[in-house]
């Protein structure tokens, strides 16, 4: 028989807990369970549901140990994405525990959950105030736990309520509490800057603390605050400088150097005082971190001027030593400082060319990527080829790292290949083009070599995904053709090789636009233009619409220069090429791109006229091909013009492009006149034709067949038309059916077979008449150099000068541009790790104001607003009264005045005094009413 007073299962658990017997799953059991159920997502999800159900039951338990265990497990589960905001009140209960271990768990959970719920922080404020008071009940560790937890859940309202308690803790006798309070104040200042303004002296006094850890915490907090707003800390420069001179703690010295870096950016006067001390510190210390921060302070703090070579050499010599270090991190950050010094003045780093070239072959690709940014500062005529050769080898050769393993006696080596990422290859191509073309190719003394480099880059860029490199390579070919006249034959030979390469057409089509433009613009250099035309038209399937736009005019230019190099035996070839071009442009005239379609139709009509004239003219070339066609393109030779020149041209401010020349009525009237003139001309032509028939044809004397056989030359109108046809080359004469049919037919079979043969050789017109055919498949440009003989420098044309116009309007030709390079707005789907702060734009103009004074000023502002509202009400009443007086006697106006709520006597007295001291209210209200 069971007793009524037998203990239950819960009572037994409670009795066994003091002896170490726990029946709930601990955090360790939870982790083991997750690992054991991690086979499939379904099993893991089922396990999580079971654990969450158990935690919900445990967290509602009256036993604080069980509640703490559940909160700890929920804190761990939050990392898997399970929200724990529903148990915030239970977390608050655990935080209020007097046991140290339970309080730690509570503050840990609060740091992960309370920031989502601002209401729970109102309940936690009193608990935080209680835990922050150091007395006999609270030991040092509990206060430290509260300070650490406070910094993670701080909000503006909580910071305002807790700031005074934290400043009180700065006077604690325990250095540990003072240090923790200073670090907690950092988050308070970010959310509530008024606390720093009102208690600035109390906070700064900790820089003179007896304990070095407290001073270190104060310097660190000031350093971090100066990143947000350095202005209020400039007045501390003498005190901070004194600490820098006297202290021997390297950590504090580093923090002070970082702090002076931020301050000197807004206060240039600090340079004269700080620079000698920092240079002295660099010479006296052996600590690598201090030396690096000293150089960083000089560079980032704007202390290094463009003409200060002595300071620059002192910094660069130290960085040179770091670059020889075995530590890759030290080499990397040294390259960063090298680059920043080079941006100030490139002459500073010009003497370190050998070091930078060596860094270009570093085993760490990230160091290579930083070293390649330094190349532009060291390049000259002497080392350009060495730099380009070093970079080009990295495209082809596979670098390896030899890793030594094993003991000294039996030493083994392992070869690890260095994988070059694609972004580094893209960077190399851009740098090679940039350093070679800089300052109008001033560093290039061998343009045959540079032609070969550009050709190799075009071949290497086929496997790179960034196809914009092809456009840059094409621009280099174009610049060489325009700016280096003596190398045009070599350059155009390389261009012909490129467009004849099917791999280039398929994998790097972006290089074709500029290359095809060069072939058209400088087609006088090509002797057999008919073969070049066949090459260009055969690859039409690879050309994009932008390339087709350039191709149309390029083909016409090549044809014009080739056919005008006229020989008697070329007449048939000219006719065949002309037919091929007409057929080619007929296909392009149906393009989906309007620009291609328009250009094709324009050229097609002209070539059809030229073909008609060529068939009619049996002696030589017709005037359309010999004079008219070359005049389209040979008026003048193009000169090099710098990019952006168009924006410098003068813009007429009086130019109106909006107002039409004719009004709508005038335009309609003009159109009506044109229609009437056209109708009258048509009627006159019809009447004249009837008169001619009556005059020259007699039905009684002539039969129908004889009428048809009348000689046209007896008709005076036909004679006039024939004269006009002979004198006007643009006259569209009638064609018989056979001629029209032949002009629209394709080429004969034999001609097609001959045209399908790909030309093997493109011959160039050389000035010395010593022409050697260039085989596209086998021949290469010879680059023989005589030893011991310096090659004469070729002439490079400079850009044409442009007279700069007066300052234009800001909105004139202003292109839309993106600001994402400077300001990258955070996407909504990304985690924002940036700490929210109100310190950046806070005004620290009034230092030392107490919080009471701030509240008083706030009350005065409220009273001032109430006075303004009262005056506005009086003004409205007077306006209504004036309107009522102006109304007639028959009209009735009812004004309902609401009863005003009772105000403080202080506000009433203030209103009376203000009314006494102010000018007459009637005049003020009268002025206000007139404004209204």
Curated annotation (Swiss-Prot):
Sequence segments annotated as region (Disordered): 720-868, 897-932
Pfam family, one: Adaptin_N
Residue positions where Phosphothreonine is found in the record: 767
Basic and acidic residues composition-biased segments: 738-747, 755-766, 806-832, 857-868, 923-932
UniProt biased composition (Low complexity): 767-779
GO cellular component, one term: AP-3 adaptor complex
Biased amino acid composition, Polar residues: 838-855
Coiled coil start-end: 858-878
GO biological process, one term: protein targeting to vacuole
Alphabetized UniProt keyword annotations: Acetylation, Coiled coil, Cytoplasmic vesicle, Golgi apparatus, Membrane, Phosphoprotein, Protein transport, Repeat, Transport
InterPro entries, per the entry: AP3_complex_dsu, ARM-like, ARM-type_fold, Clathrin/coatomer_adapt-like_N
Bias kind Basic residues: ranges: 783-793, 897-915
Topology class, membrane: Peripheral membrane protein
Entry keyword annotation includes Thylakoid: no
Residues carrying Phosphoserine: 700, 727, 770, 773, 798, 888, 918
Residue positions where N-acetylthreonine is found in the record: 2
General remark: Present with 13500 molecules/cell in log phase SD medium.
Function: Part of the AP-3 complex, an adaptor-related complex which is not clathrin-associated. The complex is associated with the Golgi region as well as more peripheral structures. It facilitates the budding of vesicles from the Golgi membrane and may be directly involved in trafficking to the vacuole. Required for the transport via the ALP pathway, which directs the transport of the cargo proteins PHO8 and VAM3 to the vacuole.
Subunit structure: Adaptor protein complex 3 (AP-3) is a heterotetramer composed of 2 large adaptins (APL5 and APL6), a medium adaptin (APM3) and a small adaptin (APS3). Interacts with VPS41.
Protein name: AP-3 complex subunit delta
Organism the protein comes from: Saccharomyces cerevisiae (strain ATCC 204508 / S288c)
């Amino acid at each position: 028989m069971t007793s009524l007073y037998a203990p239950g299962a819960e009572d037994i658990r409670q009795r066994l807990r003091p002896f170490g017997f726990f029946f709930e799953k601990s955090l360790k059991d939870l982790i083991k369970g997750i690992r054991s159920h991690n086979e499939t997502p379904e099993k893991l999800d089922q396990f999580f549901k079971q654990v969450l159900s158990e935690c919900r039951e445990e967290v509602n338990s009256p036993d604080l140990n069980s509640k703490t265990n559940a909160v700890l497990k929920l804190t761990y589960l939050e990392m898997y994405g399970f929200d724990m905001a529903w148990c915030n009140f239970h977390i608050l209960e655990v935080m209020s525990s007097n046991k140290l271990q339970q309080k730690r768990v509570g503050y840990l959970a609060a740091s992960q959950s309370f920031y989502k719920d601002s209401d729970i922080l109102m309940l936690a404020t009193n608990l935080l105030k209680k835990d922050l008071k150091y007395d006999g009940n609270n030991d040092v560790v509990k206060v430290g736990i509260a300070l650490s937890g406070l910094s993670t859940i701080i909000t503006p309202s909580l910071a305002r309520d807790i700031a005074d308690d934290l400043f009180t803790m700065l006077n604690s006798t325990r250095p540990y509490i003072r240090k923790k309070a200073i670090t907690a104040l950092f988050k308070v200042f970010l959310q509530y800057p008024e606390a720093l303004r009102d208690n600035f002296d109390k906070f700064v006094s900790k820089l003179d603390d007896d304990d070095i850890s407290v001073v270190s915490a104060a310097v660190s907090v000031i350093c971090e605050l100066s990143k947000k707003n350095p202005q209020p800390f400039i007045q501390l420069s003498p005190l901070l400088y004194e600490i820098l001179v006297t202290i021997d703690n390297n950590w504090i010295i580093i923090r002070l150097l970082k702090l002076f870096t931020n301050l000197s950016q807004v206060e240039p006067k600090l340079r004269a005082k700080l620079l000698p001390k920092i240079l002295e510190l660099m010479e006296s210390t052996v600590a690598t971190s201090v030396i690096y921060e000293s150089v960083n302070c000089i560079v980032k703090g704007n202390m290094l001027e463009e003409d200060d070579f002595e300071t620059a050499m002192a910094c660069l010599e130290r960085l040179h030593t770091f670059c020889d270090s075995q530590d890759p991190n030290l080499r990397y950050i040294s390259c960063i400082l090298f680059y920043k010094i080079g941006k100030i003045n490139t002459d500073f780093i010009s003497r370190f060319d050998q070091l930078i070239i060596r860094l270009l072959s570093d085993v760490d690709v990230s160091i290579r990527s930083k070293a390649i940014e330094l190349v532009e500062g060291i390049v000259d005529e002497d080392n350009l080829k060495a730099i380009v050769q070093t970079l080009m080898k990295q495209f082809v050769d596979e670098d390896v790292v030899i890793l030594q393993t094993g003991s000294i006696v039996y030493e083994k080596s392992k070869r690890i290949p260095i994988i070059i990422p694609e972004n580094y290859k893209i960077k190399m191509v851009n740098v090679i083009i940039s350093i070679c073309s800089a300052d109008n190719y001033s560093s290039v003394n061998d343009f045959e070599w540079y032609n070969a480099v550009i050709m190799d880059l075009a071949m290497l860029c086929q496997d790179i995904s960034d196809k914009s490199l092809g456009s840059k390579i094409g621009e280099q070919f174009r610049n060489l053709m325009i700016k280096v006249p003596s190398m045009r034959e070599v350059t155009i030979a390389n261009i012909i090789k490129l467009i004849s390469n099917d791999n280039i057409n398929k994998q790097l089509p972006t290089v074709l636009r500029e290359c095809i433009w060069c072939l058209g613009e400088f087609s006088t250099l090509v002797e057999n233009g008919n073969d070049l035309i066949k090459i260009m038209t055969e690859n039409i399937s690879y050309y994009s619409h932008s390339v087709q736009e350039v191709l149309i005019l390029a083909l016409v230019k090549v044809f014009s220069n080739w056919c005008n190099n006229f020989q008697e035996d070329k007449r048939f070839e000219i006719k065949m090429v002309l037919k091929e071009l007409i057929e080619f442009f007929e296909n392009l005239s149906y393009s989906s791109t309007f620009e291609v379609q328009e250009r094709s139709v324009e050229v097609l009509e002209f070539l059809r006229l030229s073909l008609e004239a060529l068939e009619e003219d049996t002696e030589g070339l017709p005037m359309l091909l010999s004079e008219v066609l070359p005049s389209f393109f040979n008026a003048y030779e193009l000169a090099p013009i710098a990019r952006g020149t168009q924006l410098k041209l003068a813009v007429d401010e009086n130019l109106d492009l909006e107002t039409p020349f004719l009004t709508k009525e005038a335009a309609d009237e003009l159109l009506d006149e044109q229609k009437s003139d056209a109708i009258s001309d048509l009627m006159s032509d019809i009447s004249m034709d009837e008169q001619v028939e009556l005059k020259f044809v007699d039905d009684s004397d002539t039969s129908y067949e004889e009428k048809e056989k009348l000689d046209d030359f007896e008709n005076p109108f036909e004679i006039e038309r024939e004269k006009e046809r002979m004198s006007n080359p643009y006259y569209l004469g009638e064609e018989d059916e056979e001629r029209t049919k032949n002009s629209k037919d394709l080429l004969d079979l034999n001609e097609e077979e001959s045209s399908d043969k790909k030309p093997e050789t493109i011959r160039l017109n050389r000035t010395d008449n010593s022409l050697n055919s260039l085989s596209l498949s086998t021949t290469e440009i010879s680059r023989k150099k005589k030893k011991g003989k310096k090659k004469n420098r070729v002439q490079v044309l400079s850009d044409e000068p442009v007279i700069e116009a007066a300052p234009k309007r800001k909105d004139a030709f202003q292109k839309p541009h993106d600001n994402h390079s400077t300001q990258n707005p955070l996407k909504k789907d990304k985690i924002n790790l940036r700490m929210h702060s109100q310190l950046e734009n806070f005004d620290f103009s009034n230092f030392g104001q107490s919080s009471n004074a701030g509240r008083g000023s706030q009350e005065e502002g409220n009273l001032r607003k109430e006075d303004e509202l009262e005056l506005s009400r009086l003004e409205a009443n007077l306006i209504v009264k004036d309107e009522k007086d102006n109304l007639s006697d028959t009209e009735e106006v009812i004004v309902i005045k609401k009863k005003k709520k009772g105000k403080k006597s202080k506000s009433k007295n203030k209103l009376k005094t203000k009314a006494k001291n102010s000018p007459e209210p009637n005049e003020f209200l009268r002025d206000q009413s007139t404004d209204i």
